Amino acid sequence: MFMATDVEIAQKAKLEKISVIAEKMGLTEEDYEQYGRYKAKLDLNLFEKNKDKKDGKLILMTSINPTPTGEGKTTMNVGLAMGLNKIGKNAISVLREPSLGPNFGMKGGAAGGGYAQVVPMDEINMHFTGDFHAITTANNLICAMMDNHIHQGNALNIDPKQILIKRCMDMNERELRDIIIGVGAKGNGVMRQDGFEITVASEIMAILCLAKDLKDLKERVGNILIAFDKEGKPVYARDVKADGAVALVMKEAIKPNLVQTLEHTPAIIHGGPFANIAHGCNSLIATKLGLKLGDYVVTEAGFGADLGAEKFFDIKCRNDLHPNMVCIVATIKALKHHGEAEDFKVENVEALEKGYANLKRHIENMKKYKVPVVVAINRFATDTDAEIKKLTELVEADGTRAIFCDVWAKGGEGAKELAEYVVENTKEENDFEFLYDLELPIKEKIEKIAKEIYRADGVEFSAKAKKKLKQIKELGLDNYPVCMAKTQYSFSDNKKLIGAPTGFTITVSDFKISRGAGFVVALLGSVMTMPGLPKVPSAENCDVLDDGTVVGLF
């Protein structure tokens, strides 16, 4: 049977002009600025206009530990938002922006799939409204001003061996992880070791996603710890006078982007930090604006619940957000993977039952936050009746509801049962609570996450990490939340330990101090903030035909 690709489905869709979508949301022409026919930037004055309006319900979409191709969080997010609208509710999908790195790498785009996509899919996946370019430019402007300051006499006495900020680009390129700059003649600047991160791991990206407004963004940029001087004192971005120029570069990027789903449900897409090497959530501004404009906001946090959801709750929600439900996305194929099955397309109830331990642990973890939990099974044609029956029994035996959804093939219609469940189970207020208190030292926060969420026996700290812990305390940052950076494929810091491993320890190899963003990143194991391309990158299949038709995106 012929199955159209995601990009083919998106290209055949009949989109409504973004002005029509905006009008349905109750917006006037003064509330947004169009970027072509089908995209717009939302004005931040909407907060003032809607300040007396009650916030809508906030639903988080997360997942089990994924396979390399992902489990369909974005697809389920879009499907649920459309399903809510199908049953007469005013829902908005609020998502992260795709990064070009995975687009051209292994994972592909981040606009959903099948008949549960945000559109125009090709434009969203390729550059969109230019936010990532602004973030990249802003980050690299700080680096350029800092290196120029050193070259022009170094009045701040910056120690070239203690520079913390790295340049960034929105591409997977391992060759740029560690480089030497300033090589050659004296006029080329001071020679020093440097490196690149992918844009989504930069502190500017985190700041965009946690700032309340442009003023807050500018203040946070000024607080970025870029280096230490030769006496060991901190040097900030404001010290090289970069904060004003960076705020100027980010003036338009801070505004959330409005698009639509294939069924014309509004979608706000803004910011895009990865959840394995950053905090993994779309912008606070987008989420809060969605809560003012819709009765239900379906948002997401990257990768598995051990990464994205934990950071959503313990970092993002500390900014006056109260989640009403968490939806864990799982697939039978991924559970069979966690059960060590060799062929995911062949019925294997035994492997499914073994792999269920991964989902079970995520369910238990999410319940620790005192938020209602539902499991959404992203249905595939290869799922058998026996597997469906067994998974339903396993989930319900643990006191949770499992709902099979076919949003890829049916769009919002395939999520109506899930939508009804969400509406019914978000009527009452819950007792949401954080996993840890901010007054705990960073070390104890890490140990709590490791033991409560990952189920590790303990935490080891490298000599480098111990030195940084002392530095963090001296800087007065022990009361910051912690952002764990580790592999997405396992509860542990070893990607080969799939399922629900026990009897392991995690190793904190280093720390990254994100003073402007307002958290401390703990780097676990061998995690890297600049990915590399796979042996056969998806870029090899991407093209544009003579008539402008895009091919190869997924």
Swiss-Prot record:
Name of the protein described by the UniProt record: Formate--tetrahydrofolate ligase
Record's keyword terms, sorted: ATP-binding, Ligase, Nucleotide-binding, One-carbon metabolism
Cross-referenced HAMAP family: FTHFS
Lineage: Bacteria, Bacillati, Bacillota, Tissierellia, Tissierellales
Domain of life: Bacteria
Family: Belongs to the formate--tetrahydrofolate ligase family.
Entry's Gene Ontology BP terms: tetrahydrofolate interconversion
Any one Gene Ontology molecular-function term assigned to this protein's record: ATP binding
Species of origin: Finegoldia magna (strain ATCC 29328 / DSM 20472 / WAL 2508)
Residues making up the signal peptide according to the UniProt record: none
Record carries keyword DNA damage: no
Positions bound to ATP: T67, P68, T69, G70, E71, G72, K73, T74
